[in-house]
Amino acid sequence: KEMQNRITADIAAFRLPRYAQIPEVGLYLEQVVRYINARLAPLGEPELTGSMVSNYVKQKLVPAPQKKLYTAEHLARLLFIAVVKPVVPLEGLRLMFSIQEECYPLQTAYDYFCDEFENMLGAAFGVAPAVEGLGETESDAKDLLRSTISATVNKVCLDRYLEEYRKRREQAETIVGKEISLL
């Protein structure tokens, strides 16, 4: 129960920054990496690295920075990539961005992603009941995004529980080891 409470507290406090909250001033690569990793730390997923960001630029998933500076557009795309990359391959991300560009402005799509991700994450961890019908329209693009978020949330759930069990086992082994050394 203690493990569940610790995870639930992390998830209850988790919020993705909305587009209007993302820094508008340009950030350098290392600042971008720190900003994104700080926001996503409660999810327990692998951290974003500078070389990963450079690769996403090279793969044209993220526009090239202007004078080595990354803007809110870059950060929104990188936050999305960092959250869903454990379940969506690069080619899938490319297709999703293409669909998004055809259907919704980045700010609208990103904010909807944040709302839906937090909604499903909270429901999966029992923090809050799922809110049905977020957003004003139904579309294939939103269905695709919801499926992506659902898969991502399930992976986050699994990873967090496995990590907590791993920590618990290590602690138990440490205690047993100390007891044996006392004999």
Regions found by a protein language model. Give the residues of each.
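Basic helix-turn-helix/winged-helix DNA-binding cores
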Residues: 1-101
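Intrinsically disordered, low-complexity, charge-dense segments enriched in Lys/Arg
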Residues: 105-183
